[in-house]
Amino acid sequence: MPRIRELGIYDSALPPGPRNAISDVAGVTVGHFTLIAGTSDTGPAWRPGSGPFRTGVTLVIPHGGNLYQDKVVAAIHTINGFGKPHGFEQVRELGLLETPIALTGTLNVPRVADALITLAIEHNPHIGVGFASSGWGGYSSVNPLVGETSDGYLSDLQGRPIGLSEVRAALAAASAEVAEGAVGAGTGTSCYGWKGGIGTASRVLPGGEELTPRRLRPFAPLGKLSAPGGYTVGALVQTNMGRAEELTICGVPIGRYLRTPEEDSRGQVTGASEERSDPGTSNLEPGPSPQGSSIMIVLATDAPLDSRGLGRLAARAAFGLARTGTPGHGGSGDFVIAFSTAATGATIHEQPLMDAFALAVVESVEEAIYNSLLMAHTVVGRQGHTRHALPADEVARLVRGHRTF
């Protein structure tokens, strides 16, 4: 299964990092736990809560130290708020992240949050009882951060199988090598009618100057973009959004031509050479929500930005999402978490520099979404529900053909 760049149809104004992953931001690691359990042939006697499960958890870990003691600056942005995340409000208020970022299926959220609390207490036993040993007389709590999308089309939501042992396993598996596709929190997700999942990408801002107004260089035209800093921006997505006919790749309306096997079985014209008679409709069974069911976007950077600056970057993620086709449906929970690994933070006031960071966010989010689709394999879930892998060769043919036309 190729990533989008391996197909030879995607290019960008800014270069990717060496892994083209969120872990190109130094110190950032990602861990997955993937649960595929139970037969998909559940039959009419199926009882919710008993499986099968096509779900998991993904952890994004900003650094390898004690995150509760050495918090990182963070920000939250809501594109559309139809979701059930945990811990977002305190990050909005204080601009700090003190646990790994966990992504999972919707009804797993409370159990995953509880697991993060347990792990935080194990490493910080003063949580909840004060800092008597250090002479500080107050009490402390912990704010576990958990994002979610609904994987209920393929997985049994009521079973809620992801808890402490699964989160421990994801933490133990954390690495700078980021697996993509139907893994971790992306095991049971759907994207534009195809199999979605986890995707990642990064961008590097060329140059070596400090982040100060006196050292900014003028910008060249797009395509020869240069910017100060040499900073990295990375994105990781959990994709579970969009209608089949909306899918757009490299500016080409792929969803107007490429039909899912489910659509073909329901009587629509087969093949990718003929446009849908009505691009605004689809016979594809949409799963739990006719609009798709959300995307979680995690952004990381090593640039010394404060929470306000990170919030400005997080807001730009919506443009990368829009490049892939979705207008942002009312029933979709679309959230962005951004953090910086730098020790100090500053707000971006200089417009040329903000433009460079914004482009890095837009491109990395767009490419991460493509990778989540192309790296995912076909998954059969509960009651025979199936999400098929997006056919990479057909996508490449359509993009090249559209450009030739």
Segments (PLM) and residue ranges:
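Alpha/propeptide regions of enzymes that mature by internal proteolysis
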Residues: 1-215, 219-267, 271, 275, ...
